């Protein structure tokens, strides 16, 4: 089993780059968007449907999988990919973000974090080692260190303390992971923290780069800050990351944010927004959002997007989708999710083509005008 990342082309005007990941025999073109399958399912889609959107890699969540179905189940089935019959690549985050979002239900110290299950209140204690052990059983190709994600408006002192704790945990995660056979086929990413503070972001990036992880994630963004703040942080922190390694921005799928992040050299993205918004009646198109619940679509015989090649757009009108929503049919979230996930993959393919043809700056301006 193996992992390689090659930069194939750099934009002449920005830091955008075209790349290729090969992980355990699976090729992934970058920049890439990963649909989120939190609980071992991308909501409303079968693995075959996911594959048909041309998604090569999906994300699952350690916190949720530890709670349900539980590690004993996943161990019996040989990991989450076999459990759900997914043949592509997978990344699992450590569950740190979910644990820290519980706020009232958790207690943090330098050893780890104690929390109560949001399902039944039962107690759990995540440590760097226990998270690694869980991710080894879950068995994703890419795995993440336990980290502490602070709020965007947290104080300097709090963010600094959380950053030091993140570094300590990253070191412990890596030391344990590297001592196991799993390091031969599971690849561990370090998470850069530091909030909105330039000096802390620089320190975090340099500390983690010195630990020599196979890839790096920019954490602590898309947590309430403005798009301008996100872009400013990215433009600074990317100066200190390793350009030879994939760089992953967690929790982002807004086209504006992806375009800005790719401009700074980000390679990987994930977010629940395309699937969640689909279930709530919002279809993404290259000309903006279609809110299919609007009564104006009741008699509309056009498809969601003329140039889209997804199953939904090849077969069904806006009027039919509007009807499915009004009658609360199960087919509605399925068809909408197929479209939105396929939209994200079409968007990323167009974006990659613009880098290959060295017209990314023009493409970014054009897409910004269409969306905003």
UniProtKB/Swiss-Prot annotation:
Its cofactor is Zn(2+). Its EC number is 2.4.2.29. Gene3D superfamilies: Queuine tRNA-ribosyltransferase-like. It catalyses: 7-aminomethyl-7-carbaguanine + guanosine(34) in tRNA = 7-aminomethyl-7-carbaguanosine(34) in tRNA + guanine. SUPFAM superfamilies: tRNA-guanine transglycosylase. Pathway: tRNA modification; tRNA-queuosine biosynthesis. Keywords: Glycosyltransferase, Metal-binding, Queuosine biosynthesis, Transferase, tRNA processing, Zinc. Zn(2+) binds at residues 308, 310, 313, 339. Substrate binds at residues 93-97, 147, 193, 220. One of its GO terms (cellular component) is cytoplasm. The active site is at residues 93, 270. Residues 275-279 are annotated as: RNA binding. The keyword Glycosyltransferase applies. Binds 1 zinc ion per subunit. The keyword tRNA processing applies. One of its GO terms (molecular function) is metal ion binding. GO terms for biological process: queuosine biosynthetic process; tRNA wobble guanine modification; tRNA-guanine transglycosylation. It is an enzyme of class 2 (transferase). Catalyzes the base-exchange of a guanine (G) residue with the queuine precursor 7-aminomethyl-7-deazaguanine (PreQ1) at position 34 (anticodon wobble position) in tRNAs with GU(N) anticodons (tRNA-Asp, -Asn, -His and -Tyr). Catalysis occurs through a double-displacement mechanism. The nucleophile active site attacks the C1' of nucleotide 34 to detach the guanine base from the RNA, forming a covalent enzyme-RNA intermediate. The proton acceptor active site deprotonates the incoming PreQ1, allowing a nucleophilic attack on the C1' of the ribose to form the product. Belongs to the queuine tRNA-ribosyltransferase family. HAMAP family: Q_tRNA_Tgt. Homodimer. Within each dimer, one monomer is responsible for RNA recognition and catalysis, while the other monomer binds to the replacement base PreQ1. This is Queuine tRNA-ribosyltransferase. The gene is tgt.
């Amino acid at each position: 089993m193996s992992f390689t990342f090659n930069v194939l082309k750099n934009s002449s005007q920005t830091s955008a780059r075209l790349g290729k990941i090969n992980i355990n025999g699976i090729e992934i073109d970058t920049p890439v968007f990963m649909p989120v399958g939190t609980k071992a399912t991308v909501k409303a889609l079968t693995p075959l449907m996911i594959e048909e959107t041309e998604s090569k890699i999906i994300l699952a969540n350690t916190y949720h999988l530890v709670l349900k179905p539980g590690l004993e189940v996943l161990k019996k089935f040989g990991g989450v990919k076999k459990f759900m019959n997914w043949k592509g690549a997978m990344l699992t985050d450590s569950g740190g973000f979910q644990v820290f979002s519980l706020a009232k239900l958790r207690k943090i110290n330098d050893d780890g974090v104690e929390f109560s299950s949001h399902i039944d209140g039962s107690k759990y204690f995540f440590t760097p080692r226990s998270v690694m052990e869980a991710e080894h059983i879950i068995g994703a190709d890419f795995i993440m260190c336990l980290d502490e994600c602070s709020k965007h408006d947290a104080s300097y002192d709090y963010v600094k303390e959380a950053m030091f704790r993140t570094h300590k945990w990253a070191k412990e995660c890596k030391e344990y992971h590297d001592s196991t056979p799993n390091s031969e086929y599971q690849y561990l990413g370090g998470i850069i923290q530091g909030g909105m503070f330039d000096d802390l972001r620089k320190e975090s990036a340099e500390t983690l780069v010195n630990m020599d992880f196979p890839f790096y994630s920019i954490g602590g963004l898309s947590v309430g800050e403005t798009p301008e703040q996100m872009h400013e942080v990215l433009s600074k922190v990317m100066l200190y990351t390793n350009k030879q390694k994939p760089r992953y921005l967690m929790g982002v799928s807004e086209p504006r944010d992806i375009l800005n992040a790719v401009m700074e050299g980000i390679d990987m993205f994930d977010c629940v927004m395309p699937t969640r918004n689909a279930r709530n009646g919002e279809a993404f198109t290259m000309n903006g959002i279609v809110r299919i619940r609007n009564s104006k679509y009741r008699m509309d015989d056009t498809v969601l997007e003329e140039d889209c090649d997804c199953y939904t757009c090849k077969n069904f009108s806006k009027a039919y989708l509007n009807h499915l929503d009004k009658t609360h049919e199960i087919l509605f979230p399925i068809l909408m999710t197929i479209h939105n996930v396929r939209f994200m993959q079409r968007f990323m393919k167009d974006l990659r083509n613009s880098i290959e043809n060295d017209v990314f700056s023009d493409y970014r301006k054009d897409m910004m005008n269409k969306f905003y």
